Amino acid sequence: MTDLISPKLGEKCFDPACGTFGFMISAYQHAIDGVDLYSLSDQEMAAFQDSFYGVELVHDAHRLALMNAYLHNVPAHISCEDSLAPSAKRLKGFDVILTNPPFGTKKGGERTSRDDISFQTFNKQLNFLQVIYRSLKADGSARCAVVLPDNVLFADGDGTSVRRELMDFCNLHTILRLPTGIFYAQGVKTNVLFFTRGKTEKDNTKEVWFYDLRTNMPSFGKTAPLKEEHFIDFVKAYTAEDRHAVDDERWSVFTREQIGEKGDTLDLGLIRDDSVLDYNDLPDPADSAEVAAANLEEAVDLLMSVVKELRALEVQD
């Protein structure tokens, strides 16, 4: 995610659910790669010192984030608070956001209390998604990669409204369908959404590309971890100069109009699952019934012949 978003030196980076600050440490390491920090001007160093922000709600995780940033020499700004609370509204104007919001409903089942998002819902991921795209700088280049569960792609009601606003505010250009159980609990299906904030708040998404890294893939877990090599084909497709020229069955595209015709669902781009029975490939039911009846008749005839032989043996005795 970090390599594809590619944070640059001096860009302000943010993780609104930072955990132990892993994404921001990765962003820091990517940004300084090949850079001599001692050669920076005072202005460049000041911008660099103000580049890496995070918010974490859990106190223990917040302390670990501070320690992790210190150990990696990251000039971090990490607050212990709720990104969905009004106090976090000050955190805006970022160039890069990398994050994996927590899974589940809002604590206590209440709606978010932020009044700077359009749709206050009980769905934590939908609230985080709104906070994320509204926290990006509206300059046409601020960008994000966020891990979200499948329900964000197809939830109706406010879910549909949030997706429409996302595609209006941002160019939602790519969705990576991840294997099951990679993030969150085993069995939870997740995705990575890649988007760039537009300069306006209307019609920024023209088409959305999907890469299916889920269907017909091996089972991943502790004994068979997902590795960088599994993403090679996706990265080739993502970075291709002409995405339409990529020859990969897992790579597909839907225009904004096609998505609208499907009710603005983003639960798209999955290829045929070879493990699932396709009922269209089954023979005609009437033909199957005739074959079954013929087999039964043959079996009955065979049984009757056995009965006759047994009766004959009884007579001989």
Where are these regions (language model features)?
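A conserved structural/catalytic subdomain of Rossmann-like adenosyl-cofactor enzymes
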Residues: 88-317
